[in-house]
């Protein structure tokens, strides 16, 4: 999980989700693309 100031999709499979006021990028196929904003 990378924590970044700005999150963006790195592949077509990435999904942007908002949980508890934070933006997350999750990717089932390639989990190394996981990111969190903050």
From Swiss-Prot:
SUPFAM superfamilies: Ribosomal protein L36 (SSF57840). Transmembrane segments: none annotated. GO terms for molecular function: structural constituent of ribosome. InterPro entries: Ribosomal_bL36 (IPR000473), Ribosomal_bL36_sp (IPR035977), Ribosomal_L36_bact (IPR047621). The keyword Ribonucleoprotein applies. The keyword Ubl conjugation does not apply. Keywords: Ribonucleoprotein, Ribosomal protein. GO terms for biological process: translation. PROSITE patterns: RIBOSOMAL_L36 (PS00828). It comes from the Bacteria. One of its GO terms (cellular component) is ribosome. It holds the Pfam family Ribosomal_L36. Belongs to the bacterial ribosomal protein bL36 family. This is Large ribosomal subunit protein bL36.
